[in-house]
Curated annotation (Swiss-Prot):
Disulfide bridge map: none
Any GO BP annotation: tricarboxylic acid cycle
Annotated organism of origin: Rickettsia conorii (strain ATCC VR-613 / Malish 7)
Family the UniProt entry places it in: Belongs to the aconitase/IPM isomerase family.
Function: Involved in the catabolism of short chain fatty acids (SCFA) via the tricarboxylic acid (TCA)(acetyl degradation route) and probably the 2-methylcitrate cycle I (propionate degradation route). Catalyzes the reversible isomerization of citrate to isocitrate via cis-aconitate. Could catalyze the hydration of 2-methyl-cis-aconitate to yield (2R,3S)-2-methylisocitrate. The apo form of AcnA functions as a RNA-binding regulatory protein.
Cofactor(s) needed: [4Fe-4S] cluster
Keywords from the named record: 4Fe-4S, Iron, Iron-sulfur, Lyase, Metal-binding, RNA-binding, Tricarboxylic acid cycle
Classification via PROSITE patterns: ACONITASE_1, ACONITASE_2
Protein known as: Aconitate hydratase A
Keyword Lyase: yes
Pathway assigned to this chain's UniProt record: Carbohydrate metabolism; tricarboxylic acid cycle; isocitrate from oxaloacetate: step 2/2; Organic acid metabolism; propanoate degradation
Binding site for [4Fe-4S] cluster: 426, 492, 495
Cofactor detail note: Binds 1 [4Fe-4S] cluster per subunit.
Catalysed conversion reaction: citrate = D-threo-isocitrate; (2S,3R)-3-hydroxybutane-1,2,3-tricarboxylate = 2-methyl-cis-aconitate + H2O
Length: 878
């Protein structure tokens, strides 16, 4: 077998009288006695990828060995077909590429070697906020405000589009990247230079996994890994375990795809599938259309899996037809999948690492909350669940049921009242069944004389223009409008924390009385402080239930048994499956997809009017508070040996489930934060602070925003919420940023201690970049979430785990200790053991064992070079 081209496996496949080349995985499997039909479909895609990417016989044999034990510790190189980005993560990625060009020039290389070698699509969707709502002109007002706030960022992206090859930008106001990917960008089977191969991707957003519902293998990575992939570097990975989920039956009653994904999230999070593939199979697939599957795949990060994959079948073809893909492309998919044994075979049993079963008929109406997406609650238990959770919000129980008057209004609010009801997120707005269902419920509510409660902020932010088109065509848009669910934008909005301000009088009442009010949204995450700083409780649910809770205005109601209005119950308003299906059949067609996506890259007049300089390197403006040349390459070219960590101080001691939102928040910038001080020092008014997410192109803001989440709890500061620590150099309580800068000034390294699932949530690389710039050398935790561990390695930060059942709690740390980490050397290997020496102020010394969570040779190289970016630049220079 040739290691260079594997040319003996190139075969011809004729489709519509055109001949294409394919890499025949059946023949390659036969040559190594690999029973291909026993291999999970997701691994068949990887097998083809390795074969086509010049994989050696040894790398192909890894798949055969996998079948023996259904797991592996062998690594493979994955070469994705393309990269998907959104603007919050995309801007810093393009900043990094621009800085890499400068670095390449600095060390005497060719700056133009820094160029994407595979297609990169960036969709601007993360910057629109719900400033205006419940009005006909809300969309236009929010778009205008978005452009005003982000004109410098958008001009930078437009510069990048002309400066880099293979890089396209979908302008703002078009859609959400994952829904655009599902409905338009994804091909299922890619063809380039006459060769056919499975579509695959990585994305700089954790919910890139959504497209696995359309049988396109992909997952989220940090921006720095995505940059490496763009520049032709393979993504080295351990061949994962694959958990099979056998689906049977069909959804019944009021259960929707949203309820299904919340059930799957609850089930799989308990199963601990972090770092594993999940693959769905069974007769139940026949009862799930692609939109339902996409909802399930979207929330893979929430259940912890690398991806949730659905094989190609007839539903895939039907969706490609519905969304207006070219007929030739559809035939390519069908014939290629059949030829390569990628078409789902209901008769042939695949072998999985483990198999779980889920009967779809057992799924019930649900919400998930109040703080984690895996905490599913049956609809009839929501009120009691909220009451049970209230003490966890440090509430004084004596006033738990008290109502408080809102100034200048004729209503009162109290704990459990819903102040935000948002139909938002690609997770659900990509699914016509729940969107039509929400509109039909709105129609019936109005017919029964019901209105949304006046303290509820309502919004509709779909993931593509097709949604508003079919709502308009069906005549149902007017009912959502009348209830206040007017279009506010085509973007992520409330789901990522861009919910905008509440009514000032409501905000005052909440703050003055310490109320625990809630948001109900059709999103995928509800981590504390994420949706809005004032909604401590957030529940996820279907768009239909979002409308229902907007009508009730409170969580303190059992919607299954208590009336929403006078003698009006949820069952009186709930649309039947037949009603929903009839509207879908009459209102959704392929022509609307073709029309709405025909000018996807054009943009508004404001976008077209943005003027940029044609140049290969970026002209940095040192006074910019949005785009700044990062300091990652100051020591480019210098030898960066791995050294033991000596006399480090503890910057923070954190608990379980610390999310990337806690580490690097995306939402609003507090007026009292270090980032706010930096901005005001640069003459930026608080009204123009924008969000942390929008300023990820400026490292000065992002360093100051690291660990600045108002809900984070550092165990070194008892009873204090927010980004504070004890500076051991002077014994005072300071912001984490200020203390870190003091340590840096005194050449003192710092480390972090944490609990389980450190770095869960979004893929944001700033949750690794920020700590790196603060001087963090290592994070010591019980476990890491997949993407964040990779990001830490990519920034040269050591991810270390305890051995056995040890935890930070066993160590009885107070933060005053001095830390040594020994055993690091040029000869580190995967899962390298090291010693951690903890020196107490009393003089007591304790030594514990830790494991360095580095998996592959490439990751070892990243650590040795100081970061993945240094490694890539120096490799490309040659």
């Amino acid at each position: 077998m040739s290691k260079v081209h594997n040319s003996e496996y190139i075969q011809e496949l004729s489709v519509d009288n055109t001949s294409y080349k394919i890499y025949d995985i059946n023949k390659a499997a036969s040559d190594i006695d690999l029973p291909l039909k026993k291999l999970p479909y997701s691994l068949r895609v990887l097998f083809e990828n390795v074969l086509r990417s010049n994989g050696s016989k040894q790398s192909l044999l890894v798949f055969k060995e996998w079948l023996k034990t259904k797991k592996s510790d062998a690594e493979i190189d994955f070469m994705p077909a393309r990269v998907l980005m959104q603007d919050f993560t995309g801007v810093p990625a393009i900043v990094d590429l621009a800085a890499m060009r400068d670095a390449m020039k600095k060390i005497g290389g060719d700056p133009l070697k820094i160029n994407p070698l595979i297609p990169v699509d960036l969709v601007i969707d993360h910057s629109v906020s719900v400033d205006s709502y419940a009005a006909k002109d809300s969309f236009n007002k929010n778009v205008q405000m978005e452009m005003k706030r982000n004109i410098e960022r958008y001009a930078f992206l437009k510069w990048g589009q002309q400066a880099f090859n293979n890089f396209k930008v979908v302008p703002p106001g078009t859609g959400i990247c994952h829904q655009v990917n599902l409905e338009y960008l994804a091909k299922v089977v890619w063809h380039k230079d006459g060769t056919l191969y499975p579509d695959s991707l990585v994305g700089t957003d954790s919910h890139t996994t959504m497209v696995n519902g359309l049988s396109v293998l992909g997952w989220g990575v940090g921006g720095i890994e995505a940059e490496a992939a763009m520049l032709g570097q393979p993504l080295t990975m351990i061949l994962p375990e694959v958990i099979g989920v056998k689906l049977t039956g069909k959804l019944t009653g009021i259960a929707t795809a949203t309820d299904l994904v919340l059930t799957v999230t609850e089930m799989l999070r308990k199963k601990k599938v972090v770092g594993k593939f999940v693959e769905f199979f069974g007769e139940g697939l026949k009862n799930l259309m692609i939109a339902d599957r996409a909802t399930i795949s979207n929330m893979s990060p929430e259940y912890g899996a690398t991806c949730g994959f659905f094989p190609i079948d007839q539903e895939t073809i039907k969706y490609l037809e519905l969304t207006g893909r070219e007929k030739t492309q559809i035939r390519l998919v069908e014939q290629y999948a059949t030829e390569q044994n990628l078409w789902y075979d209901f008769e042939h049993a695949v072998e999985y690492t483990e198999v779980l079963e889920l009967d779809l008929s057992m799924v019930h109406g649900s919400l998930a909350g109040p703080k984690r997406p895996q905490d599913r609650v049956n609809l009839n238990d929501v009120a009691s669940n909220f009451k049970y959770e209230l003490p966890n919000f440090a509430l004084d129980n004596k006033d738990i049921d008290k109502k408080y008057a809102v100034a200048n209004q004729n209503y009162e609010i109290g704990n459990g009242d819903v102040v935000i009801a948002a139909i938002t997120s690609c997770t659900n707005t990509s699914n016509p069944s729940v969107m039509i269902g929400a509109a039909l419920l709105a129609k019936k509510a109005l017919e029964h004389g019901l209105k949304v409660k006046p303290w509820v902020k309502t919004s509709l932010a779909p993931g593509s223009k097709v949604v508003t088109e079919y709502l308009k065509l069906s005549g149902l848009d007017k009912y959502l409008d009348e209830l206040g669910f007017n279009l506010v934008g085509y973007g992520c909005t409330t789901c990522i924390g861009n919910s905008g301000p509440l009514n000032p009088e409501i905000e005052e009442t909440i703050n003055k009385n310490g109320l625990v009010v809630a948001s109900v949204l059709s999103g995928n995450r509800n981590f504390e402080g994420r949706i809005n700083p004032l909604t401590k409780a957030s529940y996820l649910g279907s768009p239909i239930l979002v409308v229902a809770y907007a009508l009730s205005g409170t969580l303190n109601i059992d919607l299954t048994n208590m009336p929403i209005g006078e003698n009006i119950y949820l069952k009186d308003l709930w649309p039947s499956k037949e009603e929903i299906d009839e509207v879908i059949a009459n209102s959704i067609n392929s022509s609307m997809f073709i029309e709405k996506y025909s000018d996807i890259f054009s943009g508004t007049k404001e976008w077209k009017d943005l003027q940029v300089t044609n140049s290969s390197t970026y002209n940095w403006n040192k006074n910019s508070t949005y785009i700044n040349n990062p300091p990652y390459f100051k020591d480019i070219g210098s030898k960066n040996n791995i050294q033991d960590i000596k006399s480090a101080k503890i910057l923070a001691i954190l608990g379980d489930s610390i999310t990337t939102d806690h580490i690097s928040p995306a939402g609003s910038i507090s007026k009292t934060s270090p980032a706010a001080k930096y901005l005001t020092d640069h003459h930026i008014e608080p009204l123009d602070f924008n969000s942390y997410g929008s300023r990820r192109g400026n490292h000065e803001v992002m360093m100051r925003g690291t660990f600045a989440n108002i809900r984070i709890k550092n165990e070194m500061c008892k009873g204090v919420e927010g980004g504070f620590t004890i500076n051991q150099l002077n014994g005072t309580q300071q912001t984490i940023y200020d203390a870190a800068m003091d340590y840096k000034a005194h050449d003192v390294s710092v480390v972090i201690f944490a609990g389980k699932e450190y770095g869960s949530g979004s893929s944001r690389d700033w949750a690794a970049k920020g700590p790196g710039l603060l001087g963090v050398k290592a994070v010591i935790a019980e476990s890491f979430e997949r993407i964040h561990r990779s990001n830490l390695v990519g920034m040269g930060i050591l991810p270390l785990t305890f051995t056995g059942n040890n935890t930070r709690l066993d160590l009885k740390l107070d933060g005053s200790e001095t830390i040594d980490i020994t055993g690091l050397s040029e000869n580190i290997s995967s899962y390298h053991p090291v010693k951690c020496v903890i020196k107490k102020q009393t003089g007591a010394i304790r030594t514990i064992d830790l494991i360095l969570q580095i998996f592959t040779d490439n990751e070892i190289n990243y650590i040795k070079h100081g970061s993945i970016m240094h490694f890539v630049v120096e490799s490309l220079k040659g």
